[in-house]
From Swiss-Prot:
Domain of life of the organism encoding this protein: Bacteria
Protein name: Lon protease
Catalytic activity: Hydrolysis of proteins in presence of ATP
Primary localization class, coarse: cytoplasm
Record organism: Roseiflexus castenholzii (strain DSM 13941 / HLO8)
HAMAP family on file: lon_bact (MF_01973)
Amino acid sequence: MSTPLPTQDPPDIPEVLPILPLNNVVLFPGMFLPLVVSGDTWVKLVDEAALATKMVGVFMRTQPGEGFDPLALARTGAVALIVRMLRLPHGAVQILVQGQARIQIRQLIVTEPYPQARVAIHRDPAVLSVEVSGLARAALAAFQQIIQLSPTLPDELAIVAANTAQPGMLADLIAANLNLKPEDQQLVLDTLDVQERLRQVLSFLEREREILTIGRKAQEEMSKSQREYVLRQQLEAIKRELGETDDHAAEIAELRRRLEAANLPEEARKEAEREISRLERMPPGAAEYVVARTYLDWLLDLPWNVSTEDNLDLTQARQVLDEDHYDLERIKERIIEYLAVRKLRLEQDASGSARGPILCFVGPPGVGKTSLGTSIARALGRKFVRVALGGVRDEAEIRGHRRTYIGALPGRIIQGINRAGSNNPVFMLDEVDKLSVGFQGDPAAALLEVLDPEQNVAFVDRYLDVPFDLSRALFICTANRSDTIPPALLDRMELLELAGYTEMEKLEICRRYLIQRQRNEQGLAERAPTITEAALRRLIREYTHEAGVRDLERRIGAIYRKMATRAAEGQPLPDQVDAPDLDDLLGPPRFRSETLLGEDEVGVVTGLAWTPTGGDVLFVEASVVPGNGQLTLTGQLGDVMKESARAALTYARSRARALNIPTDFAQICDIHIHVPAGAVPKDGPSAGITMASALISALTDRRAYKHVAMTGEITLRGKVLPIGGVKEKVLAAQRAGVRTVLLPKANAPDLRELPEETRQQIDIVLVEHMDEVLPRVLHPKSESVTLAEPAPPDGAGTVQAT
């Protein structure tokens, strides 16, 4: 209850007052009002006002908020006298204020540290007309009647109102205690003319009296058995008399308005209408109410017909792609082709639309697969959505959960579309090769419908249970390897392989992207020293050994962190970082190509392997010792690799005479083939010619050239069969310092994928038979060998010549 001040002389009000905005609260002159003030600005205002005049100007905000906006303040406020102040925890202050007079802002003087303004003070005139007195009596009588009808207004309020001599203050008292909206109370406060103010209050009193009369009648008709029902009827009657609808009806009306604006497809629209009708008949307290409302929110919020316009300027799109990524020409061309097709179709038919291709980027970590998706979205002018699928084992993550489950939601595909806000985003499915199969189903199988151009026109999420058109989206998948992707899923995607970068490409990427990015991230910007080309080359060769550039960027970041530490300590920074400085900044080198290859040895041959992280150099060792013909294979070899070793042994036996090897070596010797890095599992057929070369090197006591690397499958007749991963393997050979690479002749078309720089640095020899391999791998030796004598201690593992 708000009560007026006792009659006393009004205090002197300063012309300049601090301004305190209020949310949904109106203070009338002569009334008490408790306030809780928080926020550093407003607490400071109250503290300083309490020490000075104890007066502040309070105005209601027309739009609730936290800051100060003079345009968002009501036209009229009140002078508030601080009567009592109490500090609360967390820095807030509780104050009790008394309204003194109406004020209006004439001029805003300052806004910092808190707003202060020059105000105009409005007081009610002392002498009033007879008409005003009559209106005041009518208002008092109506107010006393409402106090009798209302269960919330105390009877003492009638005495206070009767003792209020000033008509203007009586109007303020009534407006402060009636159940009015803040906007209606502000309307009374804005009315400076007392007569007009009383008329407004009388209209509010009449409305309140009608409401209370309806309530009294409803209460009189109430019985025990009908209590709950009648209470609802009473509320509805009040709302109808006010010309308002209840919250439930307003919510239904809002849903219907959103349905009209959403422009849903026919099937989705019918489902939404059915669900809204069901919701309309359901009481808001029902358990199913929230479930149905959440479903409708998803259905109406989805961008069924909201699309972003494609950027069809091919030159600009190409420029954006080149800005973000170096090289990757094949992928860039594929995106430009899609844009070109889209542009031509639109020229033929304005409503025509090309279905988005479903691309799959396969390559080792750090080559830019994920970041390429963002670049493609920017080039196309589309929204970008990324969903990480690594470790997902429940197909409901893709297809959504049925609404019968508690907490059910749509799958990640529909959630991503909703997050994008358009039905044609660039949608990246990251790490699609790392999906898991669990007892909840196979998520890879669930992706078949998403990624099939013939089916995703009407993709049905289990939660929505209505078709949604995914064909406008441009789906991009990423994977480190394609052999772990189910064949049916792989068949629906256009595979684009991203091999590792060459040294020159890494240098260019460093210059264009990595160095500047790390400078900014480490807080150096333009103060950072330049890293010379020699230092970058040494970084690439001796401190990293990867197909991508992720570790290289980490090393560059480590260099600039050292420089940032020096700068923070006030030490001078060098102008540049050169190759010799890397030992102090990064420690000793981690890799050395010359150490990796080493000296030519008997029984040790350099092979090439493909791994999910790119190509790698693989050494195969073979030793021959006296024994009874036992073959030992070590190094965690898979079944295919073991079969390659047996095929190599059979080939060596069949060619023993031609190779000047005793034909009975398989009966008098034990053979041990080992592939180092024994803790790492290895498999695949491409090490066949490498194993055969190592075995023949050991049997003939001929050293093998370490700078010659090879890959290829071998048959029992010595033919060299094609293999995969040619580009990755050749790039790995280049990183290791290999000078010659032997490849199956059938892989000749794959050489077109190699960078020109690689073809110039490495001598690539195409072979069809082991007879072409051995002369290029083994040192020449004319002597024959004898295998029956035991090998001396210093020659263990080799066959001595006789």
